[in-house]
């Protein structure tokens, strides 16, 4: 379980998180949504321990994040940031193997190959990471996170992903979320991601957190949160919310 209690963080006089309290029990995919500048990435950084709030605290398994050692925390949770640029000419395989840093031993070759296959990275193995497209880099970074968390213990695991589909084509967006669901159901993974694509969130997330101006304004199941009234008020866009006939999730359509 991950919990946040009364998180406040300000920068240059502006509150990026404003008294945020949340509890994620686990066993689900959580999507954090909101307009630009709502505080989504700031909240994600606080939930992962990369950013200390001005007040309030985050806990993992009821233990404050600031009481975890860096190594032990890295065995429980892994984080994909929006930008993962590298200055040095590492190969894709070397980047993926960096996920083993918190552990004393390297992956078995078959485990690394399995993870690269899951993330569709096999053909990229010997490429210079810096020469990859944005979408290819996102797939490689996901593979690195899975290498980091692939050990069966400790368990459960948490994946935090900041806009993981921003550069992916539609095939790899679908592949990513199918894989995340598989990890949740089969390997005791928990997923928390920041997204801008409302329909991806509606289709694949179990829980939606809506943010506006540093505050959480809604938190619940997609069909309860992604309503036409709520989204029109939040985004100021002309939209229609329908029901997806395939799975009865909300389907958000931009009006002409």
From Swiss-Prot:
Enzyme class: translocase
Organism: Shigella dysenteriae
Name of this chain's protein: Hemin import ATP-binding protein HmuV
Subcellular location, principal: membrane
Encoding gene, per UniProt annotation: hmuV
Keyword Glycoprotein: no
EC number: 7.6.2.-
Role summary: Part of the ABC transporter complex HmuTUV involved in hemin import. Responsible for energy coupling to the transport system.
Gene3D superfamilies found in the cross-reference section: P-loop containing nucleotide triphosphate hydrolases
Similarity section: Belongs to the ABC transporter superfamily. Heme (hemin) importer (TC 3.A.1.14.5) family.
ABC transporter domain: residues covered: 2-238
PANTHER family: HEMIN IMPORT ATP-BINDING PROTEIN HMUV (PTHR42794:SF1)
